[in-house]
């Protein structure tokens, strides 16, 4: 579980401040420009998320610099490091960012890579914020209070997907998921909600993400005879979907953010263009046309926008925390991160607007590009917006946006 750092030193430990100061360069110094590190997948199954992550970070920094930078100093381009979807390489990349003395790390992309790197980053007392890691297990990590995320936990996403399945009239569901932090947490959330809604879960099964043989899974799904199939996967899920379609399984597919790809119908159904017509999915998103238009203007070649609002918010909310603390040192500004997104403050929607309110001595409630973040004590957002995407006869479309909150009213 998160433990918030205690930053004040007792008198008896005053001498230790000399040591602490000497280590400043290793954990984000307070000596000028605020430098972001970006830990993202240039290769691997989530490499398609790299372009929107880079664009969102650069876009956020450009708006911060247009407003005068952080504490009046221009923010330099982010230090980039490739986590490649591999634990060893991710740790090497995280160490590179730590040794470069960045003031904050944005990333990693997947929950597994965040699990593999948070100890290196937060253990060095550097703030880490992921805009796309959604595993519920990340709410319970021992990070000293330095890990935050703007992507909602799958404990929110699971119920939204389950409710959509039931709303579409299905009463029996087969759930298949990756056997990793992302897949198992999401599966549990979906299954619990389906059970609560009175649906019959005829199959609940995980598979090795590195497998190339889905025979046992396909057999299990076929025997489950469910109305709907909830598939919780990344890129490898296209192979499983294609194989299930070949067996002519008579079920409707429901997907998660890992397969939120407008070109999925072309990837899977070369021989049967209508094979995934009717497929629906749920993914964290933002019902924010103004942000989307701004990002398109900033990065006109960008064609994947998934998690871009959440990544943008990681950068912006950290910069605002530094402004509120009057410090770029993560050991100082980290305690202000929850405060700049709390409902007790004055609502504001941009770095410039929020910074000006802080300069006037006001508390702020940053309303992010992805929605009202409102971090809880675990560094998780307590509200989120999800898009319901769909493949119809005319191709990919967004059917609806669903707001979900974990707050107890």
Go through each PLM region and give its residues.
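Extracytosolic ligand-binding ectodomains
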Residues: 2-10, 17-409
């Amino acid at each position: 579980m998160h433990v918030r750092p205690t930053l004040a030193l007792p008198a008896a430990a005053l001498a230790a401040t000399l040591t602490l100061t000497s280590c400043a360069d290793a954990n984000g110094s307070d000596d000028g420009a605020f430098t972001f590190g970006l830990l993202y997948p240039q290769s691997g199954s989530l490499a398609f998320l790299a372009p929107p992550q880079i664009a969102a970070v650069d876009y956020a920094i450009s708006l911060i610099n247009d407003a005068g930078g952080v504490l009046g100093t221009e923010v330099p381009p982010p230090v980039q490091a490739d986590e490649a979807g591999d634990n060893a390489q991710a740790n090497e990349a995280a160490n590179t960012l730590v040794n470069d003395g960045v003031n904050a790390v944005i990333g990693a992309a997947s929950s597994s890579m965040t699990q593999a790197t948070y100890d290196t980053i937060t253990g060095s007392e550097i703030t880490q914020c992921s805009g796309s890691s959604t595993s519920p297990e990340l709410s319970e990590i021992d990070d000293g209070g330095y890990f935050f995320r703007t992507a909602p936990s799958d404990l929110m996403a699971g119920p939204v997907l389950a409710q959509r399945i039931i709303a579409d009239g299905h009463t029996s569901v087969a759930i298949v998921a990756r056997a990793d932090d992302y897949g198992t947490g999401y599966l549990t959330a979906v299954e619990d909600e389906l059970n609560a809604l009175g649906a019959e879960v005829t199959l609940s099964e995980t598979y090795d993400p590195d497998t190339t043989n889905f025979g046992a899974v396909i057999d299990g799904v076929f025997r489950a005879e469910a109305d709907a199939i909830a598939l919780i996967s990344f890129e490898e899920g296209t192979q499983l979907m294609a194989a299930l379609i070949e067996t002519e399984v008579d079920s409707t597919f429901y997907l998660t953010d890992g397969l939120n790809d407008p070109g999925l119908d072309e990837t899977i159904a070369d021989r049967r263009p209508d094979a995934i017509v009717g497929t629906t999915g749920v993914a964290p998103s933002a019902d924010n046309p103004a942000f989307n238009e701004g990002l398109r203007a900033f990065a006109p070649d960008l064609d994947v926008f998934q998690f871009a609002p959440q990544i943008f918010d990681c950068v912006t909310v950290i910069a605002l925390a530094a402004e509120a603390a009057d410090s770029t040192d993560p050991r100082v500004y980290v305690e202000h991160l929850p405060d700049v997104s709390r409902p007790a403050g004055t609502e504001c929607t941009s770095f410039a607007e929020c910074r000006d309110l802080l300069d006037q001595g006001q508390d702020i409630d940053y309303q992010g590009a992805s929605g009202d973040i409102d971090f809880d004590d675990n560094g998780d957002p307590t509200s989120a917006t999800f898009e319901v995407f769909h493949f119809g006869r005319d191709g990919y479309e967004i059917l609806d946006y669903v707001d979900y909150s974990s707050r107890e009213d």
